[in-house]
Every structure is written in structure tokens, then in C-alpha cells.
Design a protein with these regions (language model features):
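Residue(s) in the substrate-gating loop at a strand-loop-helix junction
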Residues: 39
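Active-site-adjacent segment of SDR/Rossmann-fold oxidoreductases
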Residues: 21, 44, 65-75
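Substrate-binding pocket helix/loop in short-chain dehydrogenase/reductase
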Residues: 2-5
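Active-site loop immediately N-terminal to the catalytic Tyr-X3-Lys motif
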Residues: 44-50
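C-terminal helical subdomain
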Residues: 79-80, 87, 99-145
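Active-site helix of classical SDR
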Residues: 19, 55
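A short helix-coil junction within the Rossmann-fold of NAD(P)-dependent oxidoreductases
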Residues: 21-30
Length: 151
């Protein structure tokens, strides 16, 4: 249960609170760009992913709603949904067990934080009149939240 609370506090409430803090400055300037990090788990659900998937589906819904609400203020909203990425997320998921975390990526090359950062940079460097609304990013071995080729 504590993990669920932390997950929802971080992925949903954190997104809402930070957005609430920065949006007034963007609306005052009549421009800005919000980039939210979702997950492929926010696009497709999978076994034993109920709380995590729900929190990432919320990121997707919040991003879509924000995009509509902020159109009149010329504020772009981009949601980036990475797939399997070799980050500290796996360590958290496996309670700090490095061996179990590393096994997740056996047989294929996952995304790395730098890959996601490059995509964020690209999205943020587009002209003001261009917005990537929704982007699903996976390694070439991954089709979606369900299918990853390990071989």
C-alpha cells in the first residue's frame, strides 16, 4: 500500500502540483511548454501493473486535458511515454536488488535516460507553432508494454 501511495503521490499529485505552480507564469507570458513523462504503461495495461498503469493513464489524461485548457494561452503540452528504460526505476521496483533489476534487460538493449533526454530536447526545440502532443518512445526490441523481443 505504501508503494501505491508513493506512486500516486509522485506520478499524479506531483504532476498536478508542479503544473499548478508553473502554469500561472506561463499564462502571464502567453506562452510556454509543459512536457509530461508518462509511460507505455499509460497506453496499455499489463498483469500486476494496476496501480502503476493507472497512475500513468492519469498522466496521459491530465496531459490531454491540459492541452485543451491551455490552447488559448499558446502553451504547448507534450506527453512522452517511454518504454523499457534502464534507469533507477528498476532498482526501485526490485527494492534495490541490482541483480533482479538487471535481469529485466537480458537479451535486448533498452532505452537509456540519455535517449529520453534527447527526445525531450527535440520536442522542446521545435518552433512555437509546432507541438508534438503525444509521443510513445521504445527501444527497437519493444513493440508496446506487452511485447519485447529478447533474443
Amino acid at each position: 500500500m505504501d508503494d501505491w501511495d508513493t506512486m500516486i503521490d509522485t506520478n499524479v499529485k506531483g504532476l498536478l502540483y508542479v503544473s499548478k505552480a508553473v502554469i500561472p507564469f506561463m499564462t502571464k507570458r502567453n506562452k510556454g511548454h509543459i512536457i509530461n513523462l508518462g509511460s507505455v504503461a499509460g497506453k496499455d495495461v499489463y498483469e500486476k501493473g494496476n496501480a502503476y498503469c493507472a497512475s500513468k493513464f492519469a498522466v496521459d489524461a491530465i496531459s490531454k486535458s491540459m492541452r485543451i485548457d491551455l490552447l488559448q494561452h499558446h502553451i504547448k503540452v507534450t506527453a512522452i511515454h517511454p518504454g523499457a528504460a534502464d534507469t533507477e526505476f528498476s532498482l526501485v521496483r526490485f527494492k534495490g536488488n541490482k541483480d533482479d533489476a538487471a535481469k529485466i534487460y537480458d537479451g535486448y538493449k533498452p532505452l537509456y535516460a540519455e535517449d529520453v533526454a534527447e527526445v525531450i530536447y527535440y520536442c522542446s526545440s521545435l518552433p512555437q507553432h509546432v507541438c508534438i502532443n503525444d509521443l510513445v518512445l521504445t527501444c527497437t526490441a519493444q513493440a508496446n508494454a506487452f511485447y519485447t523481443f529478447k533474443g
